[in-house]
Amino acid sequence: MARVKRGVIARKRHKKILKLAKGYYGARSRVFRVAKQAVIKAGQYAYRDRRQKKRQFRALWIARINAGARVNGLSYSRFIAGLKKASIEIDRKVLAELAVNEKAVFAAIVEKAKATLA
């Protein structure tokens, strides 16, 4: 049986990993064994952080809405309760955008929520 030479396949595999590791510091971008570990770890971080990004943005939106609501004399939880009671369905992303950039519009929404609670 003939000997199988894997030079072409190995080079292709190495080039693929080293291409993914381009821009990494030191041996992480040059040495195959280290680069492979770095690429695997980077993939794990990317997977984890795609999920964390959703949580972090929601927390940011809530913080911005809370700040805007408190300026208008209402806490976040009371504001959200008022919106639910008034059946105003605006998501937190849009509310946060309004609280930061459209203060007058946000104040009007807070007043509606306040009126519903009273």
Swiss-Prot record:
Pfam families assigned: Ribosomal_L20
Recorded GO CC terms: ribonucleoprotein complex; ribosome
Gene Ontology MF term list: rRNA binding; structural constituent of ribosome
GO term, biological process aspect, one: translation
Keyword entries, A-Z: Ribonucleoprotein, Ribosomal protein, RNA-binding, rRNA-binding
Stored InterPro entries: Ribosomal_bL20, RIBOSOMAL_L20_CS, Ribosomal_protein_bL20_C
PANTHER family: 39S RIBOSOMAL PROTEIN L20
Function: Binds directly to 23S ribosomal RNA and is necessary for the in vitro assembly process of the 50S ribosomal subunit. It is not involved in the protein synthesizing functions of that subunit.
HAMAP family named among the record's database cross-references: Ribosomal_bL20
Stated family: Belongs to the bacterial ribosomal protein bL20 family.
NCBIfam families according to UniProt: rplT_bact
Name of this chain's protein: Large ribosomal subunit protein bL20
